[in-house]
UniProtKB/Swiss-Prot annotation:
It comes from the Bacteria. GTP binds at residues 166-173, 191-195, 213-216, 284-287, 313-315. The lineage of its organism: Bacteria, Bacillati, Mycoplasmatota, Mollicutes, Entomoplasmatales. It comes from Mesoplasma florum (strain ATCC 33453 / NBRC 100688 / NCTC 11704 / L1) (Acholeplasma florum). PANTHER family: DEVELOPMENTALLY REGULATED GTP-BINDING PROTEIN-RELATED, MITOCHONDRIAL RIBOSOME-ASSOCIATED GTPASE 2. Mg(2+) binds at residues 173, 193. The gene is obg. Pfam families: DUF1967 (PF09269), GTP1_OBG (PF01018), MMR_HSR1 (PF01926). This is GTPase Obg.
Length: 432
């Protein structure tokens, strides 16, 4: 399957079903009480990490993913059915990001982990809920709430314990073949590896871990040069970084240490937290004549005196056992570093992402010629919840607007009798 690590699409939770307006009717009971049932809740959009998936190709082909709407209430106090949740399965290691703000909505970092990202709308109440001693036959009902809607980007960041980084042709793929069961393509040209390659390695102490051969980096990668951002993002989840150096002299006069500093700089520019990860220096291609002639081992040890250094040959598998043991030792204490801190609620065992609602003031707009427009989140919720299709709902709609303070605001702005006040799709005549 083609490796796709980003996909953009929209998600839409189901709307809640409308409450019903109905009355009990039976022989010899012409004026029975209200018995309109509630609407069902809309289905939610839930993301689930699936260890069997390795690409976002199927999501790349989608434009919108929608959960089912809740069903409307019915007569005889029958409640509408709940809309079915939509489960969206993604590879382990996928981030779900809100497009407009860049906010991370979910970090799918564990197999079977579920996160509710778009919550379904609550079902509206039927008229049976509004009966009281003053109004025994109400025609009041609520419309179902609108389900949440987001434009999102899914971004797969490979989940591995160890990441091999270095310049193109440093021998990372050959080294991965030497220490694992992975068979990445190997050739003598730059950017042989265009996608992360994973392998499972076992050290002599019996410990096992996942190693990622990450595509070669070049100067400017942190700014996106040479597909830098596509490569660097996969390093963020690795608990240990193995920096592979080419000791063969293939870079001519370029100094091995300067090459290291170049790549290290790109890592930190991309994400400063990468500077905190444990690092092992892997001096590779020690089997070559150039490596023997250059006699750089002492210089390398001196420069990296505060780091663990291993001299290996991926081609001949020389000293790879020592490398594996050093990696295993580092992993004993290397902690997983979360990419974000998510405040979450728990909803039926599923982690739920809660967007913080913006505090938006009510907006009064004077359109001129006796026309006004009212807007804002508070007003929209009233407009959406109470359709003015019955006399009782019209009275309740006006009462809710009054309590919101919008009437006082209109008076302060100079609204007069006979003026038209537009509340979204409704046009109301001011009667003061």
């Amino acid at each position: 399957m083609k490796f796709i690590d980003t996909a953009k699409f929209t998600i839409k939770a189901g709307n809640g079903g409308n409450g019903a307006v109905s009355f009990h009717t039976a022989l010899f009971v012409p004026n029975g009480g209200p018995n309109g049932g509630d609407g069902g809740n809309g289905g939610s959009v839930i993301f689930e990490a699936d260890g069997g998936k390795h690409s976002l190709l199927d999501l790349k082909l989608q434009k919108q993913l929608s959960a089912q709407d809740g069903f409307k209430g019915d007569i005889k106090n029958m409640h509408g059915a709940q809309g079915k949740d939509l489960i969206v399965r993604v590879p382990v290691g996928t981030l779900i990001i809100e497009n407009k703000t860049g906010t991370i909505l979910a970090d799918m970092d564990e197999d079977k982990k579920q996160v509710l990202v778009a919550k379904g709308g609550k079902g509206g109440k039927g008229n049976a809920r509004f009966a009281n001693s003053r109004n025994k036959a109400p025609t009041i009902f609520e419309a179902g709430e609108i389900g949440q809607f987001y434009e999102v980007k899914a971004e797969l960041k490979v989940l591995a314990d160890v990441g091999f980084v270095g310049l193109p042709n440093a021998g990372k793929s050959t080294l991965l073949r030497a220490i694992s069961n992975s068979k990445p393509e190997v050739a003598d040209y730059a950017f042989t590896t265009l996608n992360p390659q994973l392998g499972v390695s076992r050290a002599k102490d019996g410990s096992t871990f996942v190693v990622a051969d990450l595509p070669g980096l070049i100067e400017g990668a942190s700014l996106g040069k040479g597909l830098g951002h596509q490569f660097l993002k996969h390093i963020e989840r690795c608990r240990v970084i193995c920096h592979v150096l080419d000791m063969s002299g293939n870079y001519g006069q370029e100094d091995v240490i300067k090459n290291y500093e170049l790549i290290r700089s790109e890592l930190v520019k991309y994400n400063y937290k990468l500077d905190e990860r444990p690092e092992i220096i892997v001096a590779n291609k020690m089997d070559t004549d150039e490596a023997q002639l250059n006699m750089m081992e002492e210089d390398i040890k001196k420069y990296f005196k505060d780091k663990k250094v291993v001299f290996v040959s991926g081609l001949l598998k020389d000293n790879v056992d020592e490398l594996l043991l050093k990696i295993a030792k580092e992993l004993e204490t290397a902690k997983y570093v979360p990419l974000w801190e998510m405040e979450q609620d728990i909803y039926e065992g599923i982690k739920v992402y809660r967007l913080e609602e913006d505090e938006e003031d009510i907006q009064i707009i004077n359109k001129g010629n006796g026309r006004w427009e009212v807007a804002g989140d508070t007003i929209y919720k009233i407009y959406q919840k109470f359709p003015i299709t019955t006399d009782d709902n019209l009275l309740l709609f006006n009462e809710k607007l009054k309590k919101s303070g919008v009437y006082d605001m209109l008076r302060e702005r100079g609204v007069g009798a006979g003026d038209i006040v537009k509340v979204f799709e409704y046009e109301l005549e001011w009667m003061d």
